[in-house]
Amino acid sequence: MVVNIESGPLESFLMKHVIFDCDGTLIDTSARQYQLFAGIKELIQELSPHCLLYVWTARGRSSTLRILEELGVSTYFDGVSAWEDSLPKPHVEGLQNLVGLFPRDSVCVIGDSPNDIIGAKNFGVLAIGALWNKEAQRDFLEDSGADFIVSHPSECSKLIEQNLKAE
């Protein structure tokens, strides 16, 4: 796990915590050259002043960090849990490593796959299903227990504001 939290421990407990899946949620891996999905950078920039942001991925750590750096968003993230850091999704170990100390009602996961949603629900946090990836399927996200399903990153901010508590 890589963590570079700038705020102190007390401030961390007073913030909301948003965990993004990497491939298919943050990054469009179907493109010839990896790119952020439309609206993702704006969402990250909007959330970062009042949320701690993390990446929970089945991708390797060095690859994840390199891609986030190349796409100009690495500095927005306070932690990364990659495949070598924990048991594979949907196991909750990666989430525990990232935000295990924080109240569950201050945490959400945004992901495009059933494993993202199942992991979030097993961990006891809000799960937002992301449909902006053309491979994502609404019925799979619904069947996995997503609390909300959204079609564009811009829909996430209001849900996070209304449904997460900053303790």
Each model region followed by its residue ranges:
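Active-site neighborhood of HAD-like aspartate-dependent phosphohydrolases
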Residues: 2-38
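Glycine-rich phosphate-binding loop signature in dinucleotide/nucleotide-binding domains
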Residues: 13, 49-51, 101-106, 163-167
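Conserved SAM-binding loop
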Residues: 26, 53, 109-110, 149
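Short, acidic loop-to-helix structural element flanking the phosphoryl-transfer center
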Residues: 34-55, 61, 65, 92
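Surface-exposed amphipathic alpha-helices with a cationic face
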Residues: 41-49, 99, 117-122
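A short, structured active-site edge motif that brings together acidic residues
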Residues: 74-89
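Conserved Lys-Pro-Asp/Glu-containing loop-to-beta segment of HAD-superfamily phosphomonoesterases
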Residues: 89-119
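Acidic, Mg2+-coordinating phosphoryl-transfer loop and its flanking beta/alpha structural elements
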Residues: 108-148
